[in-house]
């Protein structure tokens, strides 16, 4: 996979690009809450190339050590560059925090005509640091939104805890549930502690083109199905131009990736062994999780093909 590197200083965004030999008209941007030079982003890019489209990975520079007041203009600049190189169709895809990035960008950049949000929530996230302070993997960026636009921070849902209680909540809930990590209670507390006002909700009704929202009922990181349901209702009650596809599964937890991408990440037998150690909810449901990933894969592939031909 040939990769071209981009920097904020030179290009207006931090990213990697891998063109497809099969299609120089459509490109999909992978959004990730870490530096794009990661195994999972590069695997997603390889998977997109094999799906017949060019792929770009975008994320914050390493020095940011997280996503806090991250300018969504990074995505806008990448879209402009792709279109200047002949890519008439530009899409975005994100999972977990990356889905918040994808949705928040797509509602502000009309040139994005395919948005794939895996395990999304419907409100703008608080800013986060991944700087390993005091041995924590994540902590809230106090007083900071995850994103900014035109120099202004987006209104956001405040974190219910500060450091170090925030990360301790992750570990404690994971221990109670038998998972490596869990934060369902933390996110529920965030909603209970702050009104879900319209300004912090992502205005998904402004998204153009194709939109896929996918999640699982056994997700213990946050209640993605609740967020998906609210977004679906918002879209159906508006004069939205998007072609919405909602995919909700009984089993697949927070790691809801297309099956063909999972096989690039890990050998098939390994994912069945590893998942129960990450999320106890998958114990006894390996076949059901795989069936969900296969179904998701088929829907995404068919949507990409339809989008490319449209």
Q: What are these regions, as identified by a protein language model?
A:
Residues 260-310:
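Catalytic active-site module of serine/aspartate enzymes centered on a nucleophile-bearing elbow/loop
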Residues 1-26, 292:
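N-terminal cap/lid segment of alpha/beta-hydrolase-fold proteins
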Residues 94-98, 102:
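Gly/Ala-rich beta-loop-alpha elbow adjacent to hydrolase catalytic centers
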Residues 39-57:
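Short amphipathic alpha-helix adjacent to the substrate-entry channel of hydrolases
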Residues 220-230, 257:
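Conserved alpha/beta-hydrolase "acid-adjacent" motif
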Residues 58-91:
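Catalytic nucleophile-loop/oxyanion-hole region of alpha/beta-hydrolase
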Residues 207, 213-215:
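Short beta-strand/loop motif that positions the catalytic acidic residue
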Residues 116-203:
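Accessory cap/linker subdomain of secreted extracellular hydrolases
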